[in-house]
Amino acid sequence: MIIADLKNIAGRTYPARRLTQNLVGGASPIHAINFSMGNVTLEPNGGQVPWHNQDQEEIYFIVEGTGEMCLGEEKQTVGTGQAVYIPSKVFHQLTNIGSTPLRMIYCYGPAGDVAHWRQELDGTLPRAGIEAPPLPKGAQEQCTKKPGDNQ
């Protein structure tokens, strides 16, 4: 039996003010063929999973907190206990709009890394409305900071 214990997974911090801890896949001791899963903590007041897309379909489950979810041309507020289905290749973004951390579980399939992790760390994330489709009207701005930027 293989067990991944969240308290023993350091995870990775991203410029958009979030911590991602892989529970299945990545640095986790658990690896699956058909899906990857992890825990994400978005810092209060703007922590974000920036506007991106990927080949895999995905689910975000909000464990606690309040966020603005953008999916394609749609924008909605999501909160504790809600799940969002993200179809393959559709651009999406989740921003913490609350004053407390937002925690969510992601699950996507098939398993594997997704390009936006590396792009964000390299500062090469496609920018909304330039290299990527625009965000929905009135959405929180996409974070495209590079590691070390203090902006």
Predicted segments, located by residue:
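Structural motif
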Residues: G46, I59, T66-E68, K75, ...
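Short hydrophobic/aromatic-rich beta-strand segments that constitute the beta-sheet cores
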Residues: Q21, M69-L71, M104
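A short, N-terminal "cap"/entry segment at the start of jelly-roll beta-barrel domains
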Residues: M1-F35, P50, R118-Q151
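Short, conserved beta-strand element in jelly-roll/cupin
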Residues: N34, N39-P44, N53-M69, C107
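A generic "binding-loop/recognition-motif" signal
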Residues: L19, D55-Q56, E74, V90-F91, ...
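Short beta-strand His + acidic residue motifs that chelate non-heme Fe in jelly-roll/DSBH
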Residues: V49-W51, M69-C70, I86, H92-G98
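A short hydrophobic beta-strand segment most commonly corresponding to one strand
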Residues: V40, I59, Y85, T100-A115
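Short acidic-glycine-tyrosine-enriched beta hairpin
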Residues: E73-S88
